[in-house]
Amino acid sequence: MKRGHEPKPAFGGAGEAGPGVMAERPLVPACPTGRPGRLQRHLLSGEFDQLRDFRIFESNFVQVTRLGEVANKVTMGVAASSPALELPDLLLLAGPAKENGHLQLFGLFPLQFVQLFVHDESRWQLKVKFRTGRAFYLQLRAPPESRDREFGQWVRLLYRLRFHSAQGAVPFTQDYSALEDDEDDDEDEDRDLPAGELQAMEARLDPQMSELWGL
């Protein structure tokens, strides 16, 4: 993975420091032109008035199984519910509707109920796990020339969410194997479960099956 990039514009794409901005090496929206991403544009469409003002860091993924098989397309983003927050506190999940393929928001969850892991760096994969035990795997969909940089932004975000303190976040230049180690421990627990239970815990993201979230 490429490291040591220059500091990026502010979280949410403002490009300047301001309320809610992450102080050190802030993240930027995953759209190289600075144009709002699909999820941001969807929220601006007027259907979700309470979410219109959220600044979102988002990327496009495909959901994959533990064996790497592609299940469906997913857009995942994080947002801060208040400009006073230094870090995002909400996770948003969206995907194409079965009827017309238009983007559909089918999950908004407090990040306190979610764990994010680096699942496979070489394949740009993250693992998302809820406190209920439900888990799924997402592989980044991005142009080859920007994929490493964009995945690196998610890794930095994971660090901030995991290690942020009143004194500031842990520097992102350090090795992030700790994130992978935590995920490995979680995988060891999974291996002790019968195959049927493992399959039941691996959630398929489907806007028509909201009961999968259990939240």
Curated annotation (Swiss-Prot):
<dbReference type="InterPro" id="IPR022168">
    <property type="entry name" value="GARIL-like_Rab2B-bd"/>
</dbReference>
<comment type="subunit">
    <text>Interacts (via N-terminus) with RAB2B (in GTP-bound form).</text>
</comment>
<feature type="region of interest" description="Disordered">
    <location>
        <begin position="1"/>
        <end position="20"/>
    </location>
</feature>
<comment type="similarity">
    <text>Belongs to the GARIN family.</text>
</comment>
<dbReference type="GO" id="GO:0051607">
    <property type="term" value="P:defense response to virus"/>
</dbReference>
<feature type="region of interest" description="Disordered">
    <location>
        <begin position="174"/>
        <end position="215"/>
    </location>
</feature>
<dbReference type="GO" id="GO:0005794">
    <property type="term" value="C:Golgi apparatus"/>
</dbReference>
<dbReference type="GO" id="GO:0032481">
    <property type="term" value="P:positive regulation of type I interferon production"/>
</dbReference>
<comment type="function">
    <text>RAB2B effector protein which promotes cytosolic DNA-induced innate immune responses. Regulates IFN responses against DNA viruses by regulating the CGAS-STING signaling axis.</text>
</comment>
<keyword id="KW-0333">Golgi apparatus</keyword>
<dbReference type="Pfam" id="PF12480">
    <property type="entry name" value="GARIL_Rab2_bd"/>
</dbReference>
<feature type="compositionally biased region" description="Acidic residues">
    <location>
        <begin position="178"/>
        <end position="191"/>
    </location>
</feature>
<dbReference type="GO" id="GO:0045087">
    <property type="term" value="P:innate immune response"/>
</dbReference>
<protein>
    <recommendedName>
        <fullName>Golgi-associated RAB2 interactor protein 5A</fullName>
    </recommendedName>
</protein>
